[in-house]
Structures are given as C-alpha cells and as structure tokens.
From Swiss-Prot:
One GO term describing the cellular component: cytosol
EC number(s) stated in the UniProt entry for this protein: 5.3.1.1
Matches recorded under HAMAP family: TIM_B
Transmembrane segment boundaries: none
Localization: Cytoplasm
Name of the protein in its database record: Triosephosphate isomerase
Sites where the protein binds substrate: 9-11, 174, 214, 235-236
Principal place of residence: cytoplasm
Gene Ontology MF terms in the entry: triose-phosphate isomerase activity
Disulfide cross-links: none
PROSITE patterns found in the cross-reference section: TIM_1, TIM_2
Entry keyword set: Cytoplasm, Gluconeogenesis, Glycolysis, Isomerase
Active site, per annotation: 96, 168
Length: 251
C-alpha cells in the first residue's frame, strides 16, 4: 500500500537559525497530533546537519533539495549524494522545475543524479511537469512521458520502487493560474498508467505520486481526495508551521 506524503520544499529560504527554529516548531506541533501522512522537509544544504541533530527524524523526515551527478572530484560548488547520505538524511528532491529552467538540468543529467542518489540509499523525490506553452498546445502528456522515460526507465523495478514522483505543472506555480482537481487527477492517472506499462500494476500501485503546483491550505483537501493524488510537494506554504499543518491535516 502506497504512502501519503507531504513534503515541504524550503527552497532558498531561512537562515540557519531560522531554519532550526522552524523545524523544531514543526516537530513539536506534530508530536501533539496524529497525522495520516509522512512529513518530510527538504532544506538548504547549510541547514542539514544542524536540523538533523535537532529534530526527531521519525516525526519529521529530512531531505536535501539536490545532489550532484558525479561521485566526487573537482566540481566546485557541488554536493554529492554520498555527502548528503553521510549526514543521515533520507530524501532528496531531483528534477524540480526551477533546476530544469534555471540551471539547465536535462533528463539525461537527472538520470545520473537519480543513479547517484539510489547508490547512496537516498530516496529521490523526482519532479515532472509541463510549462504553460506545452499545456496550451496539448502536449503535456508527451512531455511528462518523455521526462519519466528518459530519466527513470533505465532503472530496475527494484530501484524504481524506491522513487517518489511529484507532478508539478509549471504553469500553475506562482502564476495565478491553478490546476483543477480534475486536471490533476487526470495527469496522475496518466502517470500511473505509464508506470503500469513499464513496471507492472504492483509497482505502479505502490508508487506515491505527489502534486506540486501551488498546493495550499485552501485547496489541499480537494486535491488529496483524488484517489491517485498521494500528497503534496509544498513550497512557500511550508515556511509557516500553521499553514503547513493545515495541508498535512488535509488527509
């Protein structure tokens, strides 16, 4: 049975001190509640060690926001999957639309990043999704299929079952546009069918597919009620405990 998961992606926000305080505040709030999902926060690299040493990672699981596509070496500014894993971190976001758009990460580069993550026992939260031009042209299914096939389908079934997927329609992030629950469910069904075609029904059914397009306290419940939406990848709304809790409690 697949898990319900809510992931907070802090992006490039919060100083170290602010981040440690926020993580601890979230942990304390969750201790007082019975929630029906796993809660993960993916924080800046600079915060990982301090937060790992501060919180109970059985209550709030911890992830990074990226890892390098190389093992080690002369790659100034990069952080390897092995370095992240050595902290004790369990998860890493890969393929986020901002990494694709601003840093030129291609499907082939991302395949290498996923490979590095899996080899170091990190669980990839792998992002896929189309931009507005592709949605308007009706090409969203083609784009998403290509992202999945080129980045992920060289992995064995045993490796693939460790991966979490997150659909983020780029056109619905910070644009004032929103994907309807029907549009979201349609895409999640399509994604699951791609997995069925390649890995079979069992693995498709156990793969968590999250939604990452401006999911907030106001729309989380109507999104999460869809049978193929297994949670959310949350950006700005994860930076305030009360707001983030409202999304977590939408399950």
């Amino acid at each position: 049975m697949r898990k319900n998961i809510v992931v907070g992606n802090w992006k490039m926000n919060k100083t170290l001190q602010e981040g440690v305080f926020l993580a601890k505040e979230l942990e304390l709030a969750l201790k007082e509640r019975k929630v029906n999902c796993d809660v993960i926060i993916c924080v800046p690299f600079t915060h990982l060690v301090a937060i790992f040493e501060t919180i109970n990672t059985k209550i709030v699981k911890l992830g990074a926001q990226n890892n390098a596509d190389r093992v080690s070496g002369a790659y100034t500014g990069e952080v390897s999957a092995a370095m992240i894993a050595s902290i004790g971190v369990q998860y890493v976001i890969l393929g986020h639309s901002e990494r694709r758009a601003y840093y030129g990460e291609t499907n082939i580069i991302l395949k290498e990043k996923v490979k590095m993550a899996l080899e170091n026992n990190l669980i990839p939260i792998f992002c896929i999704g189309e931009v507005l031009k592709e949605r308007v042209a009706g090409k969203q299914n083609i784009v998403v299929r290509k992202q999945i096939e080129e980045s992920l389908f060289d992995f064995s079934a045993e490796d693939f079952r460790k991966i979490i997927l997150a659909y983020e329609p780029v056109w619905a992030i910070g644009t004032g546009r929103t994907a309807t629950p029907v549009q979201v469910q349609e895409m999640h069904i399509f994604i699951r069918q791609i997995l069925i075609d390649n890995y079979g029904q069992a693995i498709a059914n156990e793969t968590s597919i999250l939604y990452g397009g401006s999911c907030n306290a106001g729309n989380a419940k109507e999104l999460f009620i869809n049978p193929d939406v297994d949670g959310g990848l949350i950006g700005g709304a994860s930076l305030k405990v009360d707001t983030f809790l409202s999304i977590i409690e939408a399950f």
